[in-house]
C-alpha cells in the first residue's frame, strides 16, 4: 500500500510535519499514519474519498509556500513534492500568498558545496533531523517564528561562517524532498534522469563507506547516499571528501597505469 509522505524517513525520528500520510480510522477520524501506533481491531482506510480530499488540500497549502521553478530547478525529476503534485493533478496552488514580498529569503551561497534556497522549503524538517540525529552536527535548525520561519544556521550567518558547525557531509541535500537544498558543484551539469548510477566504496579511508556515483558521459557528476543495512554507513553518512572529493577520478593528470622509471623518465608499463 502506497501512502504519500514528504517528511518521513525510516532513519529519522517521526514528526508528522507534512501531514501527507493522513489516513482514516474508525475511532479517531483522520490521523497521520507515521505517528499513529497500530492497535488490534483498528480499521484503517488509506485512500478513502475523505482522505484523498484532505491530502490534496494539504498539498495545495504546501505548494502555496513553495517557489515553483521546475523548469530551472536542479531537483526536477527527483522531487517528491513535484511527484505528488503530478499525482494529485495540482499544477498551481489555489491559495494566494499573503505578503509574499515579505517572505522572500536570501540564499545561502557562502560556500562551494551546498546551496540552500529557503523559498523552496516546505519546513518538513528532514534536513534538520538528519543533521542532528544522524550526522550529529547541529548545524541547522528552524529559525525565526511564524510566517518567517525557515531553515537556517546559528544567527543566520551561513553554512561556512565561523560559528557554523556544518561539516559539508551533504546529508541534508540527500534528504530534501523539494530542491531547497542542492549541490553546487553539479549545478547545471545534469538531472537525475540524465545520470546512470553505480554503488562503490569510498577510496579515502578504511571505513569503507558506500557511495552512489551519479555519472553522465562517463564522468562523476555528484555523489549520493546509499541506504543499506550491514554497511559502515547504513543511514547514508559521508564525509566532505567522499561527497565532494572525487573529481580527481576524471583529472587529466591521474595515473591510470603503473609507471616505472627508466633512464631517468617515468614510463607506462603493463600490469603484468
Where are these regions (language model features)?
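N-terminal export/assembly segments and adjacent metallocofactor-ligating motifs
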Residues: 24-27, 42-66, 72-272
Amino acid at each position: 500500500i502506497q501512502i504519500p509522505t514528504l517528511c518521513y524517513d525510516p532513519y529519522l525520528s517521526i514528526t508528522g510535519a507534512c501531514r501527507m500520510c493522513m489516513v482514516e480510522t474508525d475511532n479517531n477520524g483522520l490521523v497521520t499514519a507515521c505517528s499513529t501506533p497500530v492497535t488490534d481491531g483498528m480499521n484503517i482506510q488509506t485512500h478513502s474519498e475523505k482522505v484523498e480530499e484532505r491530502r490534496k488540500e494539504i498539498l495545495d497549502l504546501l505548494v502555496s509556500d513553495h517557489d515553483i521553478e521546475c523548469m530551472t530547478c536542479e531537483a526536477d525529476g527527483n522531487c517528491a513534492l513535484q511527484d505528488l503534485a503530478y499525482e494529485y493533478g495540482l499544477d498551481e496552488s489555489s491559495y494566494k500568498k499573503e505578503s509574499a514580498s515579505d517572505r522572500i529569503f536570501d540564499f545561502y551561497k557562502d560556500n562551494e558545496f551546498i546551496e540552500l534556497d529557503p523559498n523552496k522549503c516546505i519546513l518538513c524538517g528532514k534536513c534538520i533531523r538528519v543533521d542532528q540525529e544522524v550526522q550529529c552536527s547541529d548545524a541547522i535548525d528552524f529559525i525565526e517564528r511564524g510566517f518567517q520561519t525557515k531553515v537556517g544556521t546559528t544567527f543566520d550567518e551561513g553554512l561556512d561562517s565561523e560559528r557554523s558547525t556544518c561539516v559539508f557531509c551533504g546529508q541534508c541535500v540527500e534528504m530534501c524532498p523539494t530542491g531547497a537544498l542542492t549541490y553546487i558543484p553539479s549545478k547545471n551539469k545534469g538531472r537525475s534522469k540524465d545520470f546512470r548510477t553505480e554503488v562503490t566504496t569510498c577510496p579515502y579511508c578504511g571505513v569503507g563507506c558506500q557511495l552512489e556515483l551519479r555519472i553522465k558521459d562517463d564522468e562523476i557528476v555528484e555523489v549520493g547516499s546509499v541506504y543499506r543495512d550491514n554497511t559502515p554507513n547504513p543511514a547514508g553518512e559521508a564525509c566532505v571528501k567522499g561527497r565532494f572529493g572525487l573529481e580527481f577520478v576524471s583529472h587529466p593528470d591521474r595515473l591510470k597505469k603503473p609507471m616505472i622509471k627508466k633512464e631517468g623518465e617515468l614510463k607506462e608499463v603493463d600490469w603484468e
